Curated annotation (Swiss-Prot):
The keyword Thylakoid does not apply. Belongs to the metallo-dependent hydrolases superfamily. HutI family. Its cofactor is Zn(2+); Fe(3+). One of its GO terms (cellular component) is cytoplasm. It catalyses: 4-imidazolone-5-propanoate + H2O = N-formimidoyl-L-glutamate. It comes from Acinetobacter baumannii (strain ACICU). This is Imidazolonepropionase. Fe(3+) binds at residues 66, 68, 236, 311.
Length: 401
């Protein structure tokens, strides 16, 4: 049955621009957009329900394309340490950082991980997020990576959201492989990834390319394994130093390379040539009080698509509002509100390989949208905090919170 959503204005975000339709209407059928356009051009038809959106501005549902939403415990004590002058690298070297979350995650049951993650993700959902990517990477052995990935699949079953699962086994070195990073990479490639993929738990493969994690050569071994399994790749790259990880990601036609504070112009050119999306993570940049900015002007000049994401994680970005990340992306990185909104809609969809079905409001795409009680889409980026009045529609059905 067809449902009519009328009396609205639309920022479709096609081609990464507002692409306005004023005095508009949307017709949904099931979970898809059947028709979209100006109200006066609405085809004559019979509708099972008509919804008055009261002059709202409608945008695509937000896509949070880089999160670590499933984890045990939290790291508020480390937050204090960093404010006392201890660096992220020093915390990691002393057994904190990712290692402390690994311990807490291994100790937690699937049910505990699921319940804590659902609380966080419902906050994101109320902020307008309709699609989310979630990484493993706090288990670091087969049993616990599998546990995390199973929880991610359960989240997709529990919530009316699109949930994409990324295996980030190459996130850090587990304690049982201390000083044996090559052996751990071999274990990931020969044991973990093939088994997890065979169970249908993995949509993409990620790794952390950094001096305190894994080298480009080690990451390439993971990428080759993912490629052999037919899985797309992503990469944490150039967050703390320049190792050429983003160029490596480009060589493997990665969906995205993420963080990118220390990338060079050669890296930018490589990503532009491969179509790899640059995912910027202003929450981590802000919380770590970084001073090295991603090369925004170069990315724009060379036509690299820019996405924004929360990087929701317990250590460096405990961010429960993607809308706040929009403001940070504009304020810290000088993105325009239009560029920021593209970063959590169509460009974020491209970072997940979902651009054919999600990320913009077009006929035939999934009916995920948010109707905002605002006077212009830039307000979504402009207002800091609070809960902007909105109606969230997922797969053609309004979500009641």
């Amino acid at each position: 049955m067809k449902k009519l959503w009328q009396n609205c204005h639309i920022a479709t975000m096609q081609n990464g621009q507002y692409s306005y339709i004023e005095d508009a209407a949307i017709v949904t059928e099931g979970h898809l957009i059947h028709w979209i356009g100006k109200q006066q051009q609405l085809p004559t038809d019979t509708y099972s329900e008509t919804v008055d959106l009261n002059g709202a501005w409608v945008t695509p549902g937000f896509i949070d394309c880089h999160t670590h939403s499933v984890f045990g415990g939290n790291r508020s004590v480390e937050f204090e340490k960093r404010l006392q002058g201890v660096s992220y690298a020093e915390i990691a070297a002393s057994g904190g950082g990712i290692a402390s979350t690994v311990r807490a995650t291994r100790e937690a049951s699937e049910e505990q991980l699921l319940n804590s993650a659902l609380k966080r993700i419902r906050c994101m959902q109320q902020d307008g997020v309709t699609t989310i990517e979630i990484k493993s990477g706090y288990g670091l052995n087969y049993e616990n990576e599998r546990k995390m990935l199973r929880v991610i699949r359960q989240i997709g079953e529990k919530l009316p959201m699109t949930v994409k699962s990324t295996c980030l086994a190459a996130h850090a070195l587990p304690p049982e492989y201390k000083d044996q990073s090559d052996a751990y990479i071999e274990h990931i490639c020969t044991e973990m990834l093939p088994k997890l993929h065979a169970e249908g738990l993995v949509d993409a493969v990620d790794a952390f390319c950094e001096h305190l994690a894994f080298s480009p050569a080690q990451v390439e071994r993971v990428f080759k394994t993912a490629q052999s399994l037919g899985l797309p790749v992503k990469l944490h790259a150039e967050q703390l130093s320049s190792l050429g990880g983003s160029s490596l990601a480009a060589r493997y036609h990665a969906l995205s390379a993420d963080h990118l504070e220390y990338m060079t112009e050669d890296d930018v050119k490589a990503m532009a040539a491969s179509g790899t999306v640059a995912v910027l993570l202003p929450g981590a940049f802000y919380l770590l009080r970084e001073t090295q900015y991603p090369p925004i002007e170069s990315l724009i000049k060379h036509g690299v698509r820019i996405a924004l994401s929360s990087d929701l994680n317990p250590g460096t970005s405990p961010a429960l509002s993607l809308r706040l990340m929009l403001n940070m992306g504009s304020t810290l990185f000088r993105l325009t509100p239009e560029q920021a909104l593209a970063g959590v809609t169509i460009h974020a969809a491209q970072a997940l390989g979902l651009e054919q079905t999600h990320g913009s409001l077009e006929q035939g795409k999934v009916a995920d949208f948010v109707a905002w009680d605002i006077e212009h889409p830039s307000e979504i980026v402009y207002w800091l905090g609070g809960d902007l009045p909105k109606r969230v529609v997922q797969h053609g059905q309004e979500v009641i919170f």
